[in-house]
Amino acid sequence: MKASKIREMTTQELHNELKKLKRELFNLRFQLATNQLENPMRIREVKRTIARIKTIMRERELEQERANKNVK
């Protein structure tokens, strides 16, 4: 998933997507361990998407903190 598409999502949607991707990553790792995984590149894609989501969530936290500092 592209970062621009992730940025369009709300915070709640990001949390839901993060949960879904973590569940998928768990299942992919399980499939890898049992030699049932068809596309090993999917693990890499999911891990990178999780990292993108976490990065954008952190950016939003920092923006909120900066906004709160400027108000005081």
Swiss-Prot record:
Source taxon at top rank: Bacteria
Matching SUPFAM superfamilies: Ribosomal protein L29 (L29p) (SSF46561)
This protein's UniProt keywords: Ribonucleoprotein, Ribosomal protein
GO biological process: translation
Protein name: Large ribosomal subunit protein uL29
GO molecular function, one term: structural constituent of ribosome
PANTHER family found in the cross-reference section: 60S RIBOSOMAL PROTEIN L35/50S RIBOSOMAL PROTEIN L29, LARGE RIBOSOMAL SUBUNIT PROTEIN UL29C
Family: Belongs to the universal ribosomal protein uL29 family.
GO CC terms of this entry: cytosolic large ribosomal subunit
Species of provenance: Caldicellulosiruptor bescii (strain ATCC BAA-1888 / DSM 6725 / KCTC 15123 / Z-1320) (Anaerocellum thermophilum)
Record InterPro entries: Ribosomal_protein_uL29 (IPR050063), Ribosomal_uL29 (IPR001854), Ribosomal_uL29_CS (IPR018254), Ribosomal_uL29_sf (IPR036049)
Phylogenetic classification of the source organism: Bacteria, Bacillati, Bacillota, Bacillota incertae sedis, Caldicellulosiruptorales
Gene3D superfamilies: 1.10.287.310
